[in-house]
Amino acid sequence: MSNTTVTTLDDNVFERLLRERIIVLGQEVDDGVANRIIAQLLLLSAEDPATDITLYINSPGGSVSAGLAIYDTMQAVAPDVATIATGLAASMGQFLLTGGAPGKRGALAHAEIMMHQPHGGVGGVQSDIRIRADMLSRLKRQILEITAAHTGQPFERVEADAERDRWFTPAQAVGYGLVDRVLTRSP
């Protein structure tokens, strides 16, 4: 039996983008997606630690632990990681967008950006529920502190604004400090 791998047009496109130091997050963040993006960040950093990497984000969010793994890698690699919102950057997608290199975070003109507090389901016996609730509280504080640091907003404002879904236009996201600029091309 033959072990042939089928290469699709999508595979070729993403390989070509990777050669240009472009990574695309175009889906929900889960462990598999995080592992792929982390591997790409590490590869590009090893190949050329001095040249920026660009991460395009069109994601509704996803797993907090997977997103934090991507974020930590973005902060750890030598090259700056520029981030660009395309379409939707919500929840963990917004967090990763805001975690890009200072001065190198952008949003396309019609991108939608949404910030809110992390959430997750809790079930089981009472002691497990308490442990999980404590962990979620810790993660919430951690994410809000990181967001406050990247935006320059006071922690209390970020905490209040993230209590419910908070939607931003690209221009509003610039004003809040989630991104640095709106990317447009003059006709």
What is each of the regions a protein language model found here?
Residues 1-187:
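Terminal-region recognition feature
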